[in-house]
């Protein structure tokens, strides 16, 4: 077992900020080259010669097959994926416009499946590697106002479980990480957030440490699933309107 990733190239989605940026930084510190995918890098603070940003809006799923196919042809050295891109939207089901349901499914589920589909043949050709998918504690238990969001995360978890069986013979390890509330911009557009006490939230670096830890175990061992929770679970509403947490 080693804690170095020298010579490996991994793709990280959602790489410009939050969990994706923290994962990218951790991988870079361990010697990997990171192909970072994000909608834009305007606020990205990563400064490393082995970090290669690729501006790409994964929410535009109709364009992804062609774009990802071209990207795969130019990055045949890939041996791993860490899919961090995603967003949250909450509210009772009837409050969701149909287009908002589709948008959440497209980014949280379909785009992850497309990215894995595009690069899995390369990873297998290169002798195997790792795919890490970002789930959520909402993939473990559904909650009020989270029907659509939880559905996307439960689906990602099922995708990971099935892939694990499908890809083992090709030496590809599949891991899903299910974090609780992480202190990121995820909550900027929502009407609730974790309480201010640091024990009420997870830091992006905590998730990154878990991801890197899964990569460092012996090649014949798979870290199937990692569940991360804050020590406490206080949630603060930004509004007194109990009927709208979107």
Locate predicted features.
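Conserved glycine-rich cofactor-binding loop
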Residues: 16-17
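Conserved NAD(P)H cofactor-binding loop of Rossmann-fold oxidoreductase domains
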Residues: 84-89
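Substrate-binding pocket helix/loop in short-chain dehydrogenase/reductase
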Residues: 92-93, 100-105
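Active-site helix of classical SDR
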Residues: 116, 152
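Alpha-helical segment proximal to the catalytic Tyr-Lys
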Residues: 121, 161, 165-168
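Residue(s) in the substrate-gating loop at a strand-loop-helix junction
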Residues: 136
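C-terminal helical subdomain
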Residues: 170-172, 176-177, 194-236
């Amino acid at each position: 077992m080693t804690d170095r990733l020298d010579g490996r190239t991994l793709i990280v989605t959602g790489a410009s900020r939050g969990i994706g940026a923290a994962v990218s930084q951790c991988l870079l510190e361990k010697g990997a080259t990171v192909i970072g995918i994000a909608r834009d890098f305007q606020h990205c603070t990563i400064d490393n010669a082995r970090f290669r940003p690729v501006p790409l809006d994964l929410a535009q799923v109709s364009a992804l097959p062609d774009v990802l196919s071209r990207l795969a042809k130019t990055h045949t050295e890939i041996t791993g994926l860490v899919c961090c891109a995603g967003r949250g939207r909450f509210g009772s089901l009837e409050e969701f416009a149909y287009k908002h349901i589709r948008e959440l499914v497209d980014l949280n589920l379909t785009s992850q499946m497309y990215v894995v589909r595009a690069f899995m043949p390369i990873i297998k050709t290169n002798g195997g590697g790792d795919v890490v998918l970002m789930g959520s504690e909402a993939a473990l238990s559904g909650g009020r106002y989270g029907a659509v969001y939880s559905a996307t995360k439960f689906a990602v978890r099922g995708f990971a479980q099935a892939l694990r069986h499908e890809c083992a013979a090709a030496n590809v390890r599949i891991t899903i990480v299910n974090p609780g509330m992480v202190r990121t911009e995820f909550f900027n557009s929502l009407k609730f957030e974790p309480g201010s006490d640091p024990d009420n939230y997870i830091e992006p670096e905590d998730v990154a440490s878990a991801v890197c830890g899964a990569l460092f175990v012996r090649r014949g061992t798979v870290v199937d699933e990692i569940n991360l929770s804050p020590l406490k679970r206080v949630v603060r509403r930004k509004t007194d309107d109990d009927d709208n947490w979107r």
